[in-house]
Amino acid sequence: MQKAMKMVKDEDGPLNAAAKSIPSFPHCLQPEASRGKAPQRHPFPEALRGPFSQFRYEPSPGDLDGFPEVFEGGGSRKRKSMPTKVPYTHPAEEASIAQESKSLGPPNLTLLFPQPQRPKCDSQMIDLCNVGLQFYRTLEHLGGKPVKQEPVKPSAMWPQPTPPAFLPAPYPYYPKVHPGLMFPFFVPSSSPFPFSRHTFLPKQPPEPVLPRKVEPLESEETKQKVERVDVNVQIDDSYYVDVGGAQKRWQCPTCEKSYTSKYNLVTHILGHSGIKPHACSRCGKLFKQLSHLHTHMLTHQGTRPHKCQVCHKAFTQTSHLKRHMMQHSEVKPHNCRVCSRGFAYPSELKAHEAKHASGRENICVECGLDFPTLAQLKRHLTTHRGPIQYNCSECDKTFQYPSQLQNHMMKHKDIRPYICSECGMEFVQPHHLKQHSLTHKGVKEHKCGICGREFTLLANMKRHVLIHTNIRAYQCHLCYKSFVQKQTLKAHMIVHSDVKPFKCKLCGKEFNRMHNLMGHLHLHSDSKPFKCLYCPSKFTLKGNLTRHMKVKHGVMERGLHSQGLGRGRLVLVQSAGVLRNLEQEEPFDLSQKRSANGPMFQSDVDSTQDCLCQEEEEEAGEEDNCYEVEPYSPSLAPESQQLCAPEDLSTKQEQTLQDPGEGCRDQDAPEEQQEDRSEDHEGSDIDCEGKDIDCAIREERLSSRLLQSGGQGPSFSDYLYFKHRDEGLKELLERKMEKQAVLLGI
């Protein structure tokens, strides 16, 4: 015992001498033996001496044994060599040493830090004697800022709150270490490290934190590369394993894994302790090896250097690419013990065997084949039983998928949850709303190569091209009219029924065509979205704009039959696409109700029917999709106003048309009066019998202006075109329904 005491005193001599020559050493680590030989310095700042006057600090005798290099070199040199083992000290000797050192201090003061017994250290234990120094490195790195860690039971030291940090200023010989690298794990109560965060801070309720989470610091130090923590694990010959040959391997005593490198073994041993020294500076994730951190940083950079040559899928790690390549090969190394089926990955095998255990195998009852997923099994069953049909209970329609039936039932229930924010139009499907929104943006990427008309959707352009072929493959079995598209025939069948599926939600009025409803909705707002191309006039309805351009500007939408395009086609003469540009300038707003309706003027039958017929012609004309305009100038008309038309088909005698301006009496009427007439009759079904004849006479008188003597003379085909206008109007009504079918997407 006396010999051991002498050895301790001999070690205290140079230690005290070194402590004198290092005035910059932290006050809290000053050895107690130097009090008598040097001026006593209080371990606490001036502002905190009051609350801590009843405490004193005395480090344990063995706490400074692990730092001989720090005292020998003035604290500025880092240790480069492996540390030596901590000598074993008998508990009785250690207790006597602690008793003697305690007697040197003032007997009336309580120790600030309780001194635990030194743990036993044998050759195969991890030497963490440097943990104390690492803790001070952490505090220096934080600069007095607290770090969220796993709470340890604090000791009741003082009741009143004090400033959060009272340690001295940081010193230059402590390296910058990220705080999350120090204690990302639970500190047990029997840990050899006697200090904790609560030892230096006042008693306060512990904060609930998640394990291994690091708060990002606002300083510039967090942006720097994280240094590797010097956690000391001593590897000696006891870890060596003889495997034969010249190769040396070191084995882990816990799990018996062996490595050719001591560094890899140290990293592995730290993994058993939960220590992950390498932290990501962006997300705070911890890793055991630096290479794992480098690989993890690729995910933040978006870099995937390893690419599959078969499917061009990229990965961040080579191991992931190798595992992926097993999908493209026929090698299935993992076989099921029940059915001997091979799998590329162990996870797939595990999931497959779990199905055997629970009895949920995807096996075809017809042929006995097994499938990985239930969806593949259902797809396979269609080869035996045919496609599964889901029938609608309302209209007996069949669908292949239940989702299609569900969407179809929304039409019967009039559920349209997707509403356009621009015009208030409602849709059943979200992609229908997305396609409709393109019309408000004016995006038309698809152009017809024949007439040059542009379309928003490719499907609409393909349907439009069928019109140029003039092949009408779909015929109505009631009136024997033929149509180009099947959707148009479906829309045509509304004419033969009393069903009016389109209803105004504001006034309850019903319509059998969508465009009639859309035109009617403009009446509930003050907007006039249709603007004339030649003057500042604006109109609520597109039909009114068409009539205005014909009457005021002499722009005709239809040409003559003699031009070689056939009836229902336009003359490609000038300003191609003027009517095509008659787009909706600004959508109507249902929230803007009309404050007062304008006076409705009574008009003769010819004027009212003319307004309706012109709108019918315009709406049907849009379906032809190849309309172009032919300008007309009143100054070019002959002064005599006499145009020749054949009276008889056999003689072709010419006669003068009586009062050619009689049919145009209402042209000088105010535009608002004409618009109100159209709005009053919009949405009503037209009785073609009797009214079409009057419209034909009206159109014949208006079109007679185009038969100019200077340009081209009257012809027999021109006469036939206007003579049989009443038959053409019926076809115009059907073309309106074609447009309605396109809008509905039938």
UniProtKB/Swiss-Prot annotation:
Expressed in immature and mature dendritic cells (DCs). A motif (PXDLS) lies at residues 587-591. Residues 675-689 have a biased composition (Basic and acidic residues). A zinc finger (C2H2-type) spans 250-272, 278-300, 306-328, 334-356, 362-384, 390-412, 418-440, 446-468, 474-496, 502-524, 530-553. Residues 1-64, 587-689 are annotated as: Disordered. Its main location: nucleus. The keyword Zinc-finger applies. It comes from the Eukaryota. SMART domains: ZnF_C2H2. GO terms for cellular component: nucleoplasm; nucleus. Residues 452-746 are annotated as: Interaction with NRIP1. GO terms for molecular function: DNA binding; nuclear estrogen receptor binding; transcription corepressor activity; zinc ion binding. It is found in: Nucleus. Keywords: DNA-binding, Metal-binding, Nucleus, Repeat, Repressor, Transcription, Transcription regulation, Zinc, Zinc-finger. Has transcriptional repression activity. Acts as a corepressor of ESR1; the function seems to involve CTBP1 and histone deacetylases. PANTHER family: KLUMPFUSS, ISOFORM B-RELATED, ZINC FINGER PROTEIN. Interacts with ESR1 and NRIP1. Interacts (via PXDLS motif) with CTBP1. This is Zinc finger protein 366. It comes from Mus musculus. The gene is Znf366.
